[in-house]
């Protein structure tokens, strides 16, 4: 079932792109993707930012507790791979081609193309360079790897120690028990396959354009266009398919070792060919700046820069509101004073940073990393059997971050150094108001040097990188190295290609395992199917818009949103699994959870002490429908049982039901009066809080472990099932009281 659901999503996406291109000369899907991306940034930046920080605090706490000594596997299990092979595999899987695409390009962008970016205090160009390196490390550091490690630890502890199949549904086994074997598990696995494929295709979309540029640089006859890139995708897919067919130890392990070694050689070469001490100084300084500012920037939601959008068509994109029920603030101001407002004017007036920084960079990155989490997390868990929780945190979280910092700092510093050298040689003036330069005045046109001075400087191997194409920048920084330049360009080509292959084969491998419900050796035709599906999705993403990258970014952010919630539950699941492994008293004394959970309508489970004559599926469905439109009956039954007071229970139920009816009425009238929708959702939140409080007391009476945050979330998302669930539990509270 999970394979079918995921296939419908992925091939449906491919079909939608093809139909859109066929029917419209100017395809509509890219606009829709961009609107979704903007909508998520406007409404859910806080969630992306906060969850990453909470996950990091949780994992850091685990490292210094007794749980760090628990093995991912039985107590006598030994690691299957050497430390170097293990690190090479997880790093090659976790990073992909992004290093080569962004290694030089991102620091240059933040240095000369990001406008008045204000993540750190900037008063001179040295601090601007420092901020550029920091912002790059921020996007590739702790917050990036944390989703991987949460999923990896959860799967490793639950599956390796409990002998469950290695599939994403079982990461939630400590929460919902054998519900993972039913439809709920199918949905989790289908979501994981879809997120994995979209996440991997984000990297493949970036990587294929990079490979195309390197080939064109080495051979001028190679065209840089979509046709060439389509061919590259399918050639790489063929190689990746062979790797998947060979399996984990013969195929993926060998390719990962080779890929990581190529990157290591390239890093050593640029270090010894350039000013070694400058690069080491830059690394040490960058780590210090990162440690100083990562907490403040890690909680930065761009609140005031995003507020500027309210002065520009009221959070609208292509004429559609991004905040439901909110009228345009700019329209009100214009009606009052006759003065037009805009986000651009607000940015200038209040000296704000660019509002697109969040959805264009930070939220894109968080969505990208999160969409990779089921894929990389499962892969790390798969190869980490026999290692302890503490060893995995150190080796699969801290170590790759440190290596990433070395690579990004070295290449980013070389890029900024070349930018400054070219600015000095061409006597380019920097506009201190937004730290930018005029490429045309500097002798560049169409990303190519055109003036005599710029051409002569390029012949010596130096370019104004901010005036160059993003794909060319990592090649440009190697241009000054004389006879080694071509060799290093070949290394870049090989490195990108094989990072592309390792990402593709690892993604197909994980999709294959999930769809086979954890089976170690699924049929070869199934492996080929997922590799082909991945390639088709990557091609669809690439062709969805002329720029390609904007659509790729949007899909990454959209795919990451639902999995953000899933990873939050992975933290709870991991915590419970670890406590049960050590048989902590507080958790062993309580019931496993609401066995009649919000999924009961689908899985037909019953309370653990319910007699054989349990309600039929028809009765349960009827109970859910009644709770959906008239929650009073279920709430009254549950509240009276939980509080052991008929009057108080009835009052609670009446107040909650009146709140629900008022919410529903305001919701129906939301299009009539301004602010009605806001009042409606405020009332709904009040109703949810009342349901959650009753659920909390029902759990306490039934000795069911959980927490109030989960009570709130369940009540908010599926209140009819929660009410029905409590109504079914209530009689057994009465039985215990009578006993």
Could you tell me what each predicted segment is?
Residues 19-44, 210-228, 246-257, 275-282, ...:
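Membrane-lumen (extracellular) interface motif
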Residues 14-22, 91-111, 144-166, 188-220, ...:
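Hydrophobic transmembrane alpha-helices that form the core helical bundles
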Residues 180-495, 519-521, 541-548:
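Membrane-embedded translocation segments of transport machinery
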Residues 588-739:
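Intracellular leaflet-associated regions of eukaryotic membrane-associated proteins
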Residues 1, 40-46, 75-93, 121-144, ...:
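Transmembrane-helix boundary/entry motifs in multi-pass membrane transporters
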Residues 21, 29-41, 62-79, 131-139, ...:
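Membrane-water interface regions at transmembrane-helix termini and the short interhelical loops
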Residues 1-128, 572-578:
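N-terminal alpha-helical transmembrane segments of multi-pass membrane transport
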Residues 28-37, 64-83, 108-135, 157-183, ...:
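Flexible loop linkers connecting adjacent transmembrane helices
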